[in-house]
């Protein structure tokens, strides 16, 4: 049985050793928590621990390691195992990171439901599966929620906390505090909705981007520049609502000034794209000019992206609002 918070307040289990699981393990260790990293195959666990060691050493060398502990101290907090009951013993938080498959996740939470007690939080990393489906029928449903990270989690701190309709307020509060403790930026989604908040905003943006390319209003390359050299720069520091507030004499002033224009433009938005066919091929070819789609080029570009995000995160930490 998972022990109570009072006896082992520093125990966390991460179930799944892929990219998201490894990232969670590193984040929890950066906060001083003992972490058990579980996967069904011991070989997977061993490989994940090796990868974590290499990544932590590189982060320390570049001055980007999170937390007050050194890399070796953090690595000493992370252990691996391939026995689920052993992994969750002595923990107060379990972070599920298995592939985004509803049936697979339901099976895992059904197993966990049988071996935990009333003190542990059961948290899923799902990016879009609704808590009401993930946790349906569980005895410990009041202890369940989704804590959706953003890829790559180590460099992008946002975490969406999404409750099941029966999730206890204390579960949300505990998880919110835990995320803050490990340096993440949790947001409370007050009730479940398909796509949560981040993906609803992301898909709205992608949908209009696709329509603009399909209508030959802008090229795929220039479309990306609109975000990377335009909206994205200010959105890295302030959100769309604060942008509105600052771009006039406050929010009410902005709405008075621009509401009719916004409504006029919004009425011209087209139907949901199919994301296939000739337009998909056109966008693919444009992206391949910038980044060929072979593993070597994609991996190098991801590394560059992660390095940029790491430097941006450091800058944001240095630039505090007035």
Swiss-Prot record:
InterPro entries per the UniProt record, alphabetical:
3-OHacyl-CoA_DH, 3-OHacyl-CoA_DH_NAD-bd, 3HC_DH_C, 6-PGluconate_DH-like_C_sf, 6PGD_dom2, NAD(P)-bd_dom_sf
Give disulfide pairs as residue numbers. Answer: none
Q: Which GO terms describe its molecular function?
A: L-gulonate 3-dehydrogenase activity; NAD+ binding
Family of this protein: Belongs to the 3-hydroxyacyl-CoA dehydrogenase family.
Q: Which reaction does it catalyse?
A: L-gulonate + NAD(+) = 3-dehydro-L-gulonate + NADH + H(+)
Localization per Swiss-Prot or TrEMBL: Cytoplasm
Q: How is its activity regulated?
A: Inhibited by malonate.
User: Phosphoserine is carried by which residues?
Assistant: 6
Q: What does this protein do?
A: Has high L-gulonate 3-dehydrogenase activity. It also exhibits low dehydrogenase activity toward L-3-hydroxybutyrate (HBA) and L-threonate.
State where NAD(+) binds: 19-20, 39, 100, 105
Can you name this protein? Lambda-crystallin homolog
Q: Report the principal subcellular site.
A: cytoplasm
Q: Which BP terms in the Gene Ontology apply to this protein?
A: fatty acid metabolic process
Gene3D superfamilies associated with the record:
N-(1-d-carboxylethyl)-l-norvaline Dehydrogenase, domain 2 (1.10.1040.10), NAD(P)-binding Rossmann-like Domain (3.40.50.720)
- Which top EC class applies here? oxidoreductase
Q: Which Pfam families match?
A: 3HCDH (PF00725), 3HCDH_N (PF02737)
> Keyword set for this entry?
Cytoplasm, NAD, Oxidoreductase, Phosphoprotein
Its assembly, as annotated, is:
Homodimer.
Name the EC number(s).
1.1.1.45
């Amino acid at each position: 049985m998972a022990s109570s918070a009072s006896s082992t307040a520093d125990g966390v289990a991460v179930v799944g050793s892929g990219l998201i699981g490894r990232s969670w393990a590193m984040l929890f260790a950066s906060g001083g928590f003992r972490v058990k990293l579980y996967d069904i195959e011991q070989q997977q666990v061993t490989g994940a621990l090796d990868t974590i060691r290499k990544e932590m050493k590189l982060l320390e060398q570049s001055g980007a390691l999170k937390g007050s502990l050194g890399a070796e101290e953090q690595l000493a907090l992370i252990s691996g195992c391939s026995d689920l009951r052993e992994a969750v013993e002595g923990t107060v938080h379990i972070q599920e990171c298995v592939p985004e498959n509803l049936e697979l996740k339901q099976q895992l939470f059904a197993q966990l439901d049988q071996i935990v007690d009333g003190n542990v939080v059961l948290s899923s990393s799902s990016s879009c599966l609704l808590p009401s489906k993930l946790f349906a029928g569980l005895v410990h449903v009041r202890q369940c929620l989704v804590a959706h990270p953003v890829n790559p989690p180590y460099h992008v701190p946002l975490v969406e906390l999404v409750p099941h309709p029966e999730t206890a307020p204390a579960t949300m509060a505990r998880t919110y505090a835990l995320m803050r403790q490990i340096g993440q930026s949790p947001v409370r989604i007050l009730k479940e909705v398909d796509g949560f908040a981040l993906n609803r905003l992301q898909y709205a943006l992608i949908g209009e981007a696709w329509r603009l390319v399909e209508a030959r209003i802008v090229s795929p390359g220039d479309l990306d520049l609109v975000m990377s050299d335009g909206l994205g720069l200010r959105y890295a520091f302030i959100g769309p609502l604060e942008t509105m507030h600052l771009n006039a004499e406050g929010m009410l002033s902005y709405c008075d000034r621009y509401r009719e224009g916004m409504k006029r433009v919004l009425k011209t938005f087209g139907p949901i794209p199919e994301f296939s066919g000739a337009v998909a091929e056109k966008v693919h070819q444009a992206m391949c000019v910038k980044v060929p789609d072979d593993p070597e080029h994609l991996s190098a570009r991801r590394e560059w992206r992660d390095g940029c995000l790491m430097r941006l995160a450091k800058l944001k930490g240095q630039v505090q609002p007035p």
